[in-house]
């Protein structure tokens, strides 16, 4: 799969300014746990940096995040993500500089992308505590 085909499936990767590599951001509005924790005082999600703050509030950023979000169940998502990450020749990749894991299928697909990108160190901070039970 070439990069143009991959981007047609997953949209482009994001490039957070404070990270040494690329990332894959989805809308903070769609966080399963974060949506609940946003209303809890002193929770880490209460003042979420990706929830309508900074560049995350711009329409073009939100549109890109929703394109990525809608792509998560595409049958070729894993292949497309691996192609894009491998093409960047980076050492590090961050999952969800905005957004979070949606469900077990999403988590398993991320693990498969990691398997297909062995030269890259993946980082996935999450508030979805259940994911710890499914480490590969």
Q: For the regions a protein language model found, what residue spans apply to each?
A:
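Class I S-adenosyl-L-methionine
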Residues: 1-136
């Amino acid at each position: 799969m070439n990069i143009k085909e991959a981007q047609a499936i997953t949209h482009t990767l994001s490039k957070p300014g404070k990270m040494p590599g690329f990332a894959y951001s989805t809308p903070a509005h769609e966080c399963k746990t974060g949506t609940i924790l946003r209303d809890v005082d002193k929770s880490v999600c209460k003042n979420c940096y990706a929830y309508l703050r900074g560049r995350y509030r711009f329409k073009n950023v939100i549109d890109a995040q929703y394109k990525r979000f809608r792509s998560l169940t595409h049958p070729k998502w894993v292949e497309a993500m691996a192609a894009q990450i491998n093409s960047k020749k980076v050492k590090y990749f961050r999952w969800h500089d905005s957004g979070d894991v949606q469900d077990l299928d999403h988590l398993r697909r991320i693990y498969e992308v990691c398997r297909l990108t062995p030269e890259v160190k993946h980082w996935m901070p999450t508030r979805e505590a259940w994911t710890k039970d499914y480490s590969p």
